[in-house]
Structures are given as structure tokens and as C-alpha cells.
């Protein structure tokens, strides 16, 4: 699964991109539910959230 680092700017770009709704707003940064994250396998060639993240803070867990 992927996770979001502390460099997250809380912009919200990632949340609507997740096909499994595994991303939600945490208290200070967005968070990825590891149980729900498929890294977009079966949905896209690469993780959609990481592709749109302007801070490049969505990384491999």
C-alpha cells in the first residue's frame, strides 16, 4: 500500500482520484487506508493519487 508523508500540504487533490475511496482527510494531512489501497492495480497503470500530488508526498509503504 501507499502512504502519505508529513510533506502533505492538505490540498485534497488525491482524494477524488482514488478508485477504492481509501484516501480521507486526517487531522493535519490526508491519510490512506492501507487495507483499501490497491495501488490502482486493475484501475490504472500507476497510482492515480501519486500522479496528481503536487507535493510528491505519496510513497510506497
UniProtKB/Swiss-Prot annotation:
<feature type="binding site">
    <location>
        <position position="53"/>
    </location>
    <ligand>
        <name>[4Fe-4S] cluster 1</name>
    </ligand>
</feature>
<keyword id="KW-0813">Transport</keyword>
<feature type="binding site">
    <location>
        <position position="8"/>
    </location>
    <ligand>
        <name>[4Fe-4S] cluster 1</name>
    </ligand>
</feature>
<dbReference type="Pfam" id="PF00037">
    <property type="entry name" value="Fer4"/>
</dbReference>
<keyword id="KW-0479">Metal-binding</keyword>
<feature type="domain" description="4Fe-4S ferredoxin-type">
    <location>
        <begin position="2"/>
        <end position="28"/>
    </location>
</feature>
<keyword id="KW-0411">Iron-sulfur</keyword>
<keyword id="KW-0249">Electron transport</keyword>
<feature type="binding site">
    <location>
        <position position="18"/>
    </location>
    <ligand>
        <name>[4Fe-4S] cluster 2</name>
    </ligand>
</feature>
<dbReference type="InterPro" id="IPR017896">
    <property type="entry name" value="4Fe4S_Fe-S-bd"/>
</dbReference>
<keyword id="KW-0677">Repeat</keyword>
<feature type="binding site">
    <location>
        <position position="40"/>
    </location>
    <ligand>
        <name>[4Fe-4S] cluster 2</name>
    </ligand>
</feature>
<dbReference type="InterPro" id="IPR017900">
    <property type="entry name" value="4Fe4S_Fe_S_CS"/>
</dbReference>
<protein>
    <recommendedName>
        <fullName>Ferredoxin</fullName>
    </recommendedName>
</protein>
<keyword id="KW-0408">Iron</keyword>
<feature type="binding site">
    <location>
        <position position="14"/>
    </location>
    <ligand>
        <name>[4Fe-4S] cluster 1</name>
    </ligand>
</feature>
<dbReference type="GO" id="GO:0051539">
    <property type="term" value="F:4 iron, 4 sulfur cluster binding"/>
</dbReference>
<feature type="binding site">
    <location>
        <position position="49"/>
    </location>
    <ligand>
        <name>[4Fe-4S] cluster 2</name>
    </ligand>
</feature>
<keyword id="KW-0004">4Fe-4S</keyword>
<feature type="binding site">
    <location>
        <position position="37"/>
    </location>
    <ligand>
        <name>[4Fe-4S] cluster 2</name>
    </ligand>
</feature>
<comment type="function">
    <text>Ferredoxins are iron-sulfur proteins that transfer electrons in a wide variety of metabolic reactions.</text>
</comment>
<dbReference type="GO" id="GO:0046872">
    <property type="term" value="F:metal ion binding"/>
</dbReference>
<feature type="binding site">
    <location>
        <position position="11"/>
    </location>
    <ligand>
        <name>[4Fe-4S] cluster 1</name>
    </ligand>
</feature>
Amino acid at each position: 500500500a501507499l502512504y502519505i508523508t508529513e510533506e502533505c500540504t492538505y490540498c485534497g487533490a488525491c482524494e477524488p482520484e482514488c478508485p477504492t475511496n481509501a484516501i480521507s482527510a486526517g487531522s493535519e494531512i490526508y491519510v490512506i487506508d492501507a487495507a483499501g489501497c490497491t495501488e490502482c492495480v486493475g484501475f490504472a497503470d500507476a497510482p492515480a493519487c501519486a500522479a496528481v500530488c503536487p507535493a510528491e508526498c505519496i510513497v510506497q509503504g
